Amino acid sequence: MNYSFTEKKRIRKSFAKRENVLEVPFLLATQIDSYAKFLQLENAFDKRTDDGLQAAFNSIFPIVSHNGYARLEFVHYTLGEPLFDIPECQLRGITYAAPLRARIRLVILDKEASKPTVKEVRENEVYMGEIPLMTPSGSFVINGTERVIVSQLHRSPGVFFEHDKGKTHSSGKLLFSARIIPYRGSWLDFEFDPKDLLYFRIDRRRKMPVTILLKALGYNNEQILDIFYDKETFYLSSNGVQTDLVADRLKGETAKVDILDKEGNVLVAKGKRITAKNIRDITNAGLTRLDVEPESLLGKALAADLIDSETGEVLASANDEITEELLAKFDINGVKEITTLYINELDQGAYISNTLRTDETAGRQAARVAIYRMMRPGEPPTEEAVEQLFNRLFFSEDSYDLSRVGRMKFNTRTYEQKLSEAQQNSWYGRLLNETFAGAADKGGYVLSVEDIVASIATLVELRNGHGEVDDIDHLGNRRVRSVGELTENQFRSGLARVERAVKERLNQAESENLMPHDLINAKPVSAAIKEFFGSSQLSQFMDQTNPLSEVTHKRRVSALGPGGLTRERAGFEVRDVHPTHYGRVCPIETPEGPNIGLINSLSVYARTNDYGFLETPYRRVIDGKVTEEIDYLSAIEEGRYVIAQANADLDSDGNLIGDLVTCREKGETIMATPDRVQYMDVATGQVVSVAASLIPFLEHDDANRALMGANMQRQAVPCLRPEKPMVGTGIERSVAVDSATAIVARRGGVVEYVDANRVVIRVHDDEATAGEVGVDIYNLVKFTRSNQSTNINQRPAVKAGDVLQRGDLVADGASTDFGELALGQNMTIAFMPWNGYNYEDSILISEKVAADDRYTSIHIEELNVVARDTKLGAEDITRDIPNLSERMQNRLDESGIVYIGAEVEAGDVLVGKVTPKGETQLTPEEKLLRAIFGEKASDVKDTSLRMPTGMSGTVIDVQVFTREGIQRDKRAQSIIDSELKRYRLDLNDQLRIFDNDAFDRIERMIVGQKANGGPMKLAKGSEITTEYLAGLPSRHDWFDIRLTDEDLAKQLELIKVSLQQKREEADELYEIKKKKLTQGDELQPGVQKMVKVFIAIKRRLQAGDKMAGRHGNKGVVSRILPVEDMPYMADGRPVDIVLNPLGVPSRMNIGQILEVHLGWAAKGIGERIDRMLKEQRKAGELREFLNRLYNGSGKKEDLDALTDEEIIELASNLRKGASFASPVFDGAKESEIREMLNLAYPSDDPEVEKLGFNDSKTQITLYDGRSGEAFDRKVTVGVMHYLKLHHLVDEKMHARSTGPYSLVTQQPLGGKAQFGGQRFGEMEVWALEAYGAAYTLQEMLTVKSDDVNGRTKMYENIVKGEHKIDAGMPESFNVLVKEIRSLGLDIDLERY
């Protein structure tokens, strides 16, 4: 087993019983792949597939003019380079985007020519706006903030059949309906009403009989009946009535007359039910016709028009009901044979026939006019308008698009379904197999007549009792629209607007000699893209609290958004967990509240296929043997197979063991024999999402609490010193690396140089391309603000000289420890009540935890101030502020901006700014005098940026932005100078590193080689030595050595060119940077200057902060207790946290107890290792102990592959506690936890005896810190990974004495953001009334609320020292009076 450089240092002991078959895939692949497919930057112009931008252009172009003599054709598109990189965009508040240019060709045809002849072709590039680019971590920078485009789970295009579950009609009758949903275009619905008539609707408008649509498609009554019915032929003669014998139709019927064979024997007596045996007898007797009673013809419908062959008179029309009068007419006219529709109550209903009778339209045109009137009421139905509307509804590619997915879904549901034998022989089978044979193959992305008829036929067949309705919550009927597809739709809608504008101008293209760029205005495209990324419901402000929240946000799928569901209309079924979610969508992670079940998270191994359906991987099973082959199956494909679970028992050869295996088939759990099994899950954690798979012992937690646990991990604030969880699940490394928080090596190499800002790696020769200077430089992110104001800071995790492989950890980020996700801290926890301080889930915590800064977090706030040009003059950022104390001014520099490093508190001035007062408009003379003698202090007011209330911290950065043409102040200039200086140093360092690396390579390459001559009179044929090279005046002289080996000489020349290019690149980069910094900044209109101040705030743990474990066990810190009062162990160690034991049984999250026990074992093992290292035990003893730890049970580790030095380093990294991995659904068993506890605390150890363990080593004796006495009974103590959540009391605590008031009601505003007061509501008033507290009540309702005069008077009284209230009229009464007047009632107050 090969361990990477990082893994060797801290191997996580895994309790997994099953080997990992499939590595956890790249977690952000859905986002990144989707957008890459949209842009297709990797593909050459002619190799681009019809996806994304290419598809959008192809769908709109060519644009043809109204007269047809000019057209615009699309050739290809190119994306330019973005002007600013990602950090610059964030700082400047702009979008990280690249300019899109399309090459467009204008073709003008000759009007005079008899056949289409090209007269002229003009071609050029057209700017089509800017397309936002995705960052390497799958997000977008829009207007300076990182955003995520969430994938949407919507109903797939196609045809769906369902019923109302008996809810519509009081009888509980099932009303069947069908709906054809296109990707773009009108919806077509078909539905039965309670009378079994079939109707259709377009776009949910008024319903009409379905036969109108069929007539509009060109069918007449006879053809309609011919499609939807089998026929019966009756032969009329003087002897009576006979019919053709169809054996299948007789089963279950009652014989109306005696059925006789040819000899006259009775086969079935009259009145008897016909059985299968009777049918066999009838068939064997060779009967072809049956006698029927003439009365049985009554009520039947004619299948076709009956026409008198002699006179040509229509005796009866198709679908006419046979009555006695009609029969008499037939008799008179000598009709010998009539064909009727075969209808029975059981499985051949008269639905279409009855609907046809309610339909009064005659013919195709009348039907189309009826549809036109329904779609466009009030408009005159001209023939042309009627035709155009009908054709554009479903048959025009411009207005209707079923899409590739929709066509595939449609065909599989209608043309390609499996039919029963009875259906094969019926009208339905004939329709699909004969009439519409081949319709599936020719179906494009618009509807055809066959498609509509096949949908109606399938619905009728459903009502007849054949087939099943669709489950709309099945993941085979819901697909994912990812970022690329969503952006493509927006881009297409923008292009469609452009098309309308272009068509108008195309007619003048020739006469005015226009070029393509004159015709196309790209503003609608830019506007559509900007609107989508800036304000769409699916474009969300990225949750960046910690790496997990970032990854989860990018893996989210939402059923909301445009074209999706709304919270109010979504029922229980849509929100519920569906069997097809297995391995695709997490059944646990979803928000609590109104969005529950509508917003979901992808499971760990899930991915989308080409059609947008979610797939999950399975191992193939052949004849009971599990193979290594892995197939990804969609929900529909999965329904065809029998799939075993990942924990099924296998023998050493991979064969399934046991007579029966637990499996899933068609969404049901079954027991199947091994030979029936076709697939098997790849991993036990396949079912859940990333957040849920980070919960150890998830299988022992109640689902509701696991949901809370998964959601709360996303709210964990990164601690100052991240600490890996002692008990993890093994997926922590994947999350840390894939989130791009931790940096991993792009290529293997040797660490050359490390400091806090960068890591330099010299790439291995075999990974560097020939002639390239193989150096990778990793610049680290330092103290940057995240979207949630948490601190993003990367720390090097390597030292100079370390040898790394590709994928090894280079630097840790926020909330990562050694490349593993570390959201909280490992706390020693005791489950016991303690003086009521852990009542109702409160948390009692030791002062030592706060003092050691275990839960201290750094938050970075960004404060902005802008200087505008007002009507009264320009605002000025200055140090010269009226009435500002010396203490305040000391922190400002000469430009009026706070120094970096200054410690500031609430109310301190950060940026001094004055605004001209608006008392008088100045005359030109006064303006001149002002300009000469300077401004008077009285004429400006202080509008400085001050530190907000309740906030204090340290200034860590200041950025000044100045509009083009306005002179920079000294501070702005010094910032630019220092930035350029730092950048130049960086470039020089890089060049030095490149130089050193290049010459090291050259030295290794040419020492010992023969030369044909060189500097310092090197003789021909002499060997190059190290001494010779060292003796040359400059290393650059090495390039003048003429080598005999031509290949080496070429490589030398390549390296020379490469170094020269690097120098030129560095100079170019410096010039670009300089230009960017020195040119003016783009600011909003009217803004002259903007200053951003970044303040780092240290938040220590305090009472009121919310904390939680990973099992949904949340609580609020009630008290931080002095360490000497905390319960302590026999050896004097106090516990860190005391939790309430009553929080466990009712919540049913037992996982936390198992985690505590295993964590306790991890800590004990760490202590044992620490003692061994302090006693300087030999590496052999350490190896033996670690062998017992890693290879006792669970996954075996190959410790023999490690050297003694690596064993000692591994041991020293485990000093604070061992690292365990308990994968979800395959975690540590109780026996394994006991085994670890015994290893950590051996019974023969005197230290262990002192702790007073119980027999199972799960509880110990604790002592009261205040009295020193032992508690009455033993207490469960252990180690749990505990998190501090983003709900910090510092950000919520708020108090007001006076402040702003509402303009209308004159009552104090509410909420911290408005500096509002506490709400005193209706119920609180009742309480004071109940107590009879009249004076308090009066005060609350008047001077403390909205009595304007009263509160002013009260303020005066307090100043004078008179403590009395003069309560007056509350403003709310005046508001009430005004509202009554607005209703037209005159109301006046009479004063007495």
Curated annotation (Swiss-Prot):
Record keyword Iron-sulfur present: no
Coiled-coil residue windows: none
InterPro entries, A to Z: DNA-dir_RNA_pol_bsu_ext_1_sf, DNA-dir_RNA_pol_bsu_external_1, DNA-dir_RNA_pol_su2, DNA-dir_RNAP_su2_dom, DNA-dir_RNAP_su2_hyb_sf, RNA_pol_bsu_bac, RNA_pol_bsu_CS, RNA_pol_bsu_protrusion
A Gene Ontology molecular function term of the record: DNA-directed RNA polymerase activity
Top-level division of the source organism's lineage: Bacteria
Keyword flag Transport: no
Keywords: Antibiotic resistance, DNA-directed RNA polymerase, Nucleotidyltransferase, Transcription, Transferase
Cysteines paired by S-S bonds: none
Gene Ontology biological-process annotations: DNA-templated transcription; response to antibiotic
EC numbers, comma separated: 2.7.7.6
Reaction catalysed by this enzyme: RNA(n) + a ribonucleoside 5'-triphosphate = RNA(n+1) + diphosphate
A Pfam entry, by short name: RNA_pol_Rpb2_2
SUPFAM superfamilies: beta and beta-prime subunits of DNA dependent RNA-polymerase
GO CC terms in record: DNA-directed RNA polymerase complex
Top EC class for this record: transferase
Family the UniProt entry places it in: Belongs to the RNA polymerase beta chain family.
Assembly information from the UniProt record: The RNAP catalytic core consists of 2 alpha, 1 beta, 1 beta' and 1 omega subunit. When a sigma factor is associated with the core the holoenzyme is formed, which can initiate transcription.
Matching NCBIfam families: PRK00405.1 (NF001616), rpoB (TIGR02013)
Function summary: DNA-dependent RNA polymerase catalyzes the transcription of DNA into RNA using the four ribonucleoside triphosphates as substrates.
Protein name per its UniProtKB record: DNA-directed RNA polymerase subunit beta
Organism: Neisseria meningitidis serogroup B (strain ATCC BAA-335 / MC58)
